[in-house]
Amino acid sequence: MKSSYNLRSIAAKVVGQVLDQGQSLSALLPVHQREVSEKDRALLQELCFGVLRVLPQLEWCIQQLMAKPLTGKQRTLHYLIMVGIYQLHYTRIPPHAALAETVEGAVALKRPQLKGLINGVLRQFQRQQEELIQREANHSSHYLHPSWLLARIEHAYPNHWQTIVEANNQRPPMWLRVNRLHHTREAYLNLLAQEGIEAFPHTEFTDAIRLASPCAVDQLPGFSQGWATVQDASAQGCVYWLDPQDGEQILDLCAAPGGKTTHILEAAPQSHVLAVDIDETRLGRVKENLLRLQMHAEVKQGDGRYPDSWCEGRMFDRILLDAPCSATGVIRRHPDIKWLRRDRDIEELVALQKEIFDAIWPHLKVGGTMVYATCSILPQENAQQVTDFLTRHADATLVDTGTRELPGIQMLPHADGGDGFFYAKLVKN
């Protein structure tokens, strides 16, 4: 950590790295949080996530306040103005402090000559704030999504696309997965209540608990001992539908960061799990999760398209394929997805999913079960992908999961519910 720093300038740089360089916020933020004191880390996260969540609104406001946007080497100052407007409109930071710290950010970014400009734009926003926000509410920027994604969501869900978009724009709830090897869900709910933490059980997924308000993990009873894991309810549905059993050979493909790997081992502690991911760095997270929960799984780096290079001819009783996808179901947790994804990416992802799906199917034993899952809400990656797979593989049968949405189950993001997710359960004849 630097002895002195300007937090607003750091937030502006992070936003710029996401928007101009295409970097992932979840990868960037921990690196930059090390530049600030522990007490400032939550604020840095709030500013970065917040600006990316409401980006079109901030862009629209700046267009009304400035004749010409800052570009080129001054582009980071454009993002600094966004950080300032976000603070003034969305946070409880006293306006004088938000203004002063944001204006000083220009010095930290080595553009002291622009302090007056930034001060003027932010003060103008202060004066016109109510009028600007009212006008913006009637503009397409109010949906806070890129037009291509908005069009895809509206086409897929013509009757309730606005509800999905609204859920994407909200702050996500915090869900826990209770480790059934330590406590029943009811017992852990009692432990939370003793700590004054209000929580609610999920109606379908038997290990899932929603906190009334998010809290730091060190406040959770027994977190360091592995009593609970932070994992969205819909993500927990993958293992719920996989239904692993003791003694089975189980493959968790595209396993990082390991939430589903450890969930499999909680559900079937005597199973033999192979966790595979293409990203060596993210496999480190799988190992960390296994260590915290004191569990063992075989962890390998490998490309799902070429299983012969890593699975050594092994056959599996169950396979969980959490396929690479557009992540359009988890936008509320990762608002940068809206700006990192492009329309053309969807077809490329569908082709990649097909390749992995087809490549791994021969490694499922006859009578074995596969769950195909994504954290997408787009039909091309989900129901259509499974329909096409079934036409190519006569030895695949879809398991009826009791929904009318065959093939598979499509979960949509909901304010008090889980993220957007899709599951299809298949059995090999």
Swiss-Prot record:
It is found in: Cytoplasm. It catalyses: cytidine(967) in 16S rRNA + S-adenosyl-L-methionine = 5-methylcytidine(967) in 16S rRNA + S-adenosyl-L-homocysteine + H(+). It comes from the Bacteria. S-adenosyl-L-methionine binds at C254, A255, A256, P257, G258, G259, K260, D277, D303, D322. The keyword Kinase does not apply. Keywords: Cytoplasm, Methyltransferase, RNA-binding, rRNA processing, S-adenosyl-L-methionine, Transferase. GO terms for molecular function: RNA binding; rRNA (cytosine-C5-)-methyltransferase activity. One of its GO terms (cellular component) is cytosol. The keyword RNA-binding applies. CDD domains: AdoMet_MTases, Methyltransferase_Sun. Specifically methylates the cytosine at position 967 (m5C967) of 16S rRNA. Belongs to the class I-like SAM-binding methyltransferase superfamily. RsmB/NOP family. This is Ribosomal RNA small subunit methyltransferase B. It comes from Pectobacterium carotovorum subsp. carotovorum (strain PC1). The lineage of its organism: Bacteria, Pseudomonadati, Pseudomonadota, Gammaproteobacteria, Enterobacterales.
